[in-house]
């Protein structure tokens, strides 16, 4: 089957992998160490998407706890110990990537730090689907999503065009990134960030899927 896309760019958390529990466990470990009560996994999941520093700030603010100067470093160390405890690819995702990789170039664009991103991709045997230079994290040379600079970089590197590129994500951040870059977008209803998507603002050609396998039908 011929793909209408030359490049397909995936978000990581909530799109390629279900990482909510490990993120929540690390955030709660930080909160408890600061004297706060832990939060529900779902509540912390709603704080994910803008990068680790923002997640830490949101969790501490929601708990009414002043932010310690080393809060981010502590969270990253706690997450590093846990990031593969429960994180797994969404059902069917490896098969989907294998098929899509024969139709188009694949890339990852996440606000997660690049070291954690690569550990997850390597640990779950997903790195083989993405060239090393097509994996962009939130602590590299480009501004974090929803700034479109990193997505535009990936488009140019793949010698694609904006309209031949599909951004796949689960959140309003991914949707705004695609809109700013002029690419097409597919939103993952199964992801834990989908509640942030302004459904009433979606364009007629913005796609929404309920499972990874539906990507093969686009």
Regions found by a protein language model. Name each.
Residues 32-37, 63-67, 125-130, 159-160:
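Short helix-capping segments at alpha-helix termini
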Residues 30-31, 51-65, 120, 154-155:
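Helix-loop "lid/cap" segments that line or gate small-molecule binding pockets
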Residues 24, 28, 45, 49-57, ...:
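An amphipathic alpha-helix signature
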Residues 1-6, 114-218:
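Asp-based, Mg2+/Mn2+-dependent phosphohydrolase catalytic module
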Residues 4, 81-108, 114-118, 148:
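Short, acidic loop-to-helix structural element flanking the phosphoryl-transfer center
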Residues 2-46:
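Active-site neighborhood of HAD-like aspartate-dependent phosphohydrolases
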Residues 57-94:
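Metal-dependent phosphoesterase signature
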């Amino acid at each position: 089957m011929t793909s209408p896309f030359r490049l397909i760019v995936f978000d990581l958390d909530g799109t390629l992998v279900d990482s909510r529990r490990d993120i929540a466990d690390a955030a709660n470990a930080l909160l408890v160490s600061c004297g706060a009560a832990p939060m529900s996994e779902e509540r912390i999941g709603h704080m994910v998407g803008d990068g680790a520093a923002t997640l830490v700030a949101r969790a501490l603010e929601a708990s009414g706890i002043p932010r310690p100067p080393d809060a981010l470093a502590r969270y990253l160390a706690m997450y590093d110990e846990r990031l593969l405890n429960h994180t797994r690819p969404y059902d069917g995702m490896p098969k989907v990537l294998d098929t899509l990789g024969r139709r188009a170039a694949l890339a990852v664009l996440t606000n997660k730090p690049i070291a954690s991103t690569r550990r997850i991709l390597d640990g779950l045997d997903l790195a083989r689907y993405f060239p090393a230079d097509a994996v962009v994290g939130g602590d590299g040379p480009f501004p974090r999503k929803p700034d479109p600079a990193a997505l535009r970089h990936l488009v140019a590197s793949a010698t694609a065009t904006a309209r031949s590129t599909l951004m796949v994500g689960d959140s309003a951040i991914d949707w705004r990134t695609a809109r700013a870059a002029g690419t097409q977008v597919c939103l993952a209803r199964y992801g834990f960030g989908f509640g942030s998507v302004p459904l009433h603002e979606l364009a007629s050609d913005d796609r929404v899927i309920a499972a990874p396998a539906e990507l093969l039908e686009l």
